Amino acid sequence: MSVKPLVVSIMGPTASGKTAAALAVAEKIPAEIISVDSALVYREMDIGTAKPSAEELAQVPHHLIDILDPLDSYSVMQFRQDAIRLAAEISARGKLPLLVGGTMLYFKGLKDGLDALPQADAALRAELDAEAAAIGYPAMHAKLAALDPITAERLKPNDSQRIQRALEIIALTGQPMSALLAQAPKTELPFTLLPIALEPSDRSVLHTRIATRFDAMLKGGALLDEVKALRARGDLHLGLPSMRCVGYRQSWEYLDGAYSLAELRERGIAATRQLAKRQLTWLRSMDDRHIIDCLAPDASGAILQQIEIAQNRA
């Protein structure tokens, strides 16, 4: 019986140092990085996504970064197919595939499969966008709670993208997403997955990191200039998944005159903290993960130890 190749996932909330840790690991072990980030797939979106720098991208091969125009969407199933294909190609080159990112739905889709869920429907999404514009997402969340209470319970009333997707699935299939996920067959991965989670021992330090990073994005108008350029294209709008990314929505609304620069900063930091909280909630549901303190001075060393243990076990 052939031994499955090892694939390492380095997960964590935003600002937990995933990119730096992965690059440090790749300095010690021949590896390639597969991005697990629903924002990094987009071109023309570098500042607000905290995209790795040109120097970092040159340090080690990266995949699934800058593969889409902001007008396009990228589903969990597309990610799953791409990640499995890339992991096989990287393993065949004799390197270790590192799945690195914070889009927990991608990690879940990769591990568990989402075969039972339908593909996105652009026309239906436009209808849901129009309804949300009329009544607001808290009301859309209440609508979802009546149709799929299990899914609604784990979503915040302002989690527009996931609320829209859950309502879309109900409209397309006549069944709640929670029921479809429960029915979905478990699909075995063609590799052994080592799940590593970078989690903070002190959330206040993570919150400080988040604020510092958002301030750096705003410095000199960098993020606002990026969003101005996106707006100037004329074909993008806040209903698109790309423009719903944290930082972009708030900057767009600021440029619309919805609030002051100080409020943009406050809202951007608050939204990023909410994202980190959701990411940590997802991580806690993954019982098989190996937890490493992202605030530890040698987090990458701890990751390398886990990899060595897994390789020796194979």
Swiss-Prot record:
Gene that this polypeptide is encoded by: miaA
UniProt xrefs under InterPro entries: Dimethylallyltransferase, IPT, P-loop_NTPase
Site positions for Interaction with substrate tRNA: 103, 125
Reaction catalysis annotation: adenosine(37) in tRNA + dimethylallyl diphosphate = N(6)-dimethylallyladenosine(37) in tRNA + diphosphate
UniProt keyword terms in alphabetical order: ATP-binding, Magnesium, Nucleotide-binding, Transferase, tRNA processing
Cofactor: Mg(2+)
Binding site for ATP: 12-19
EC number: 2.5.1.75
Source taxon at top rank: Bacteria
GO biological process: tRNA modification
Keyword Ligase applies: no
Designated name of the protein: tRNA dimethylallyltransferase
This protein's record includes keyword Nucleotide-binding: yes
GO molecular function: ATP binding; tRNA dimethylallyltransferase activity
Coiled-coil residue spans: none
UniProt subunit comment: Monomer.
Stretches for region Interaction with substrate tRNA: 37-40, 161-165, 244-249
Top-level EC class as recorded in UniProt: transferase
Chain sites annotated for binding substrate: 14-19
Stored Pfam families: IPPT
Main function: Catalyzes the transfer of a dimethylallyl group onto the adenine at position 37 in tRNAs that read codons beginning with uridine, leading to the formation of N6-(dimethylallyl)adenosine (i(6)A).
Organism of this sequence: Janthinobacterium sp. (strain Marseille)
HAMAP family: IPP_trans
Family: Belongs to the IPP transferase family.
